[in-house]
Amino acid sequence: MSPGIKRREFLKSAVAALSLPALVAPIASGQEGAAVSPSNRITLGFIGVGGHGTGWNLDAFLKIPEARVLAVCDVYRDRREKARAMVDSAYGNSDCTDCTDFRDILAQPDIDAVVISTPDHWHVLMSVMAARAGKHVFCEKPTLTVEEGQVLRDTIARTGVVYQGGIEDRSVEIYHRMAELVRNGALGKLNRILIVLPEGEVFPKEDEAPIPEGFDYDLWLGPAPYSPYTPTKTGQQEWRNVFDYSGGKLTDWGAHLMDTAQVAMFQEHGGPTEIDGQGTFPENAMTTTASEYKIYYQYPGAVEMIVKSGGTGIRFEGTDGWLESPAWRKPLNASNPEILEAVFAPEENKMWPIPPTEHQSFIDGVKGRVTPYYTPEDIHRLSTAMHLG
């Protein structure tokens, strides 16, 4: 952590950031939302620049002319140095700065917005602190708990900053088309949805090990309960298998395909009415999340949704046929090929037009052109369904 900042002191500030008074405090500028820099480019600070933070988010924002990356932050020195070099190479200069502590990004007055690509246990706390600092927020999915989703939703509403969840599926043609067909009745009355998500990984327990040079483990843990450093749990994506940091494959992959399902049945701001299920939880292992699972959801309109481990597919079944994508982003199949050819008049179409990528949607939102398509309410509703499962 930054010099002089003890873990206990940091946790006190973290609790304060998520407390009720924080929800009603205006942003520092006193405006309804954060200001945009005079250059007319949205200036960005990146928090978390691991594999997804650079390979997906940083790479995408560097290609948007209206965005400008000013700083990168990561608790791993090698990652932030690599990301800084990536930014400087893209812009042909050496202007990008880097830091270990994300609060240095929030304190930088020339940064309009932050892009958060950290483990899940940091998502909401960083988003809340950024919003209260007057920064617009692009943050990866999901939340860690149901309560966090409520805090996120209320904080963004109170501060007036723009928020975009980092989920791309609503701008992926395959999943947008599935939702469009189902919402417009191409399958008749919807009866059942089948979703298959990856199984959880099982990692054995490890002995405590020396913290590697150039890695701030205390800041990586942040608001999570203290535990000694072991290599695997801090590895890229491997932390997803520990409940202190994530909800496992269910909340990782479910954030994609379960969102498509909820959109298809008009429940993006709703949720299930009944939930039942079972899972297999490893014993005497580092992994604490379910390695195998099967969950039964009931939604309004007598729609059953079954989510189980074992793949990456989604299938809708209705009174007039079925529609599926058998694996991640695979082409659609249907019981009748004519289902795939259905056309809906614009004035009658019950599905919104396909939006730009989540990155462009965020920039458009900050510039006041549109409301970003994945709001705090969306991520709260989706995450709630996953957490309850």
Task: For the regions a language model picked out, list residue spans one by one.
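N-terminal glycine-/serine-/threonine-rich beta1-alpha1-beta2 phosphate-ribose binding loop
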Residues: 2-139, 144, 150-163
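Non-transmembrane alpha-helical segments in soluble domains
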Residues: 11, 84, 103-106, 115, ...
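C-terminal helical cap and adjacent loop that interface with cofactors, partners, or active-site loops
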Residues: 14-17, 55-57, 246-270, 292-294, ...
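Tryptophan-centric aromatic hotspots in well-structured domains and transmembrane helices
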Residues: 30, 80, 120-122, 129, ...
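NAD(P)-dependent dehydrogenases' Rossmann-like dinucleotide-binding region
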Residues: 48, 186-204, 216-230, 273-282, ...
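Secondary-structure transition/capping motifs at alpha-helix termini
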Residues: 64, 130, 155-161, 184-188, ...
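A contiguous active-site-proximal alpha/beta segment in oxidoreductase catalytic domains
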Residues: 136, 143-219
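Rossmann-like dinucleotide-binding domain that binds NAD(P)(H)
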Residues: 218-301
